[in-house]
């Protein structure tokens, strides 16, 4: 289902994901011991982000609703982790991808700490796409 979403989204949305997939090795570098981080459910992955991202639980609900029965070989959690990144929120600055991208660009890599579980789920999901 996530693969279908990538095809159906406007080009800028697909580029956003494809750019991140191409940089997945780069994304791992700032996360200490990335390979030892467990893959957890989306709900567990966003728990450390509840105080950092406005409306994140509503975003998760919407993402999971859109990814109810994935047909792309991903689990609902995996597909929804990608959908969460793709969702546009209003105001746009509250969109999950904007917040995450700002954290990834930040000089202070300590800010990545609460994002580690989500990044692990997200990157492992992207790597499963055909």
What are these regions (language model features)?
Residues 1-130:
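N-terminal subdomain
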């Amino acid at each position: 289902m996530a693969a279908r979403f990538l095809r159906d989204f406007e080009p800028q949305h697909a580029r956003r994901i494809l750019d991140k997939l191409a940089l997945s090795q780069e994304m791992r570098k700032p996360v200490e011991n990335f390979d030892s981080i467990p893959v957890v459910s989306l709900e567990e992955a966003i728990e450390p982000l509840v105080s950092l991202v406005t409306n994140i639980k509503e975003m998760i609900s919407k993402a999971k609703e859109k990814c109810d029965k994935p047909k792309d070989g991903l689990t609902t959690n995996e597909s929804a982790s990608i959908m969460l990144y793709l969702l546009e929120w209003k105001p746009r600055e509250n969109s999950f991808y904007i917040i995450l991208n700002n954290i990834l660009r930040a000089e202070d890599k300590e800010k990545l700490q609460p994002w580690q579980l989500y990044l692990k789920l997200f990157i492992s999901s992207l790597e499963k796409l055909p």
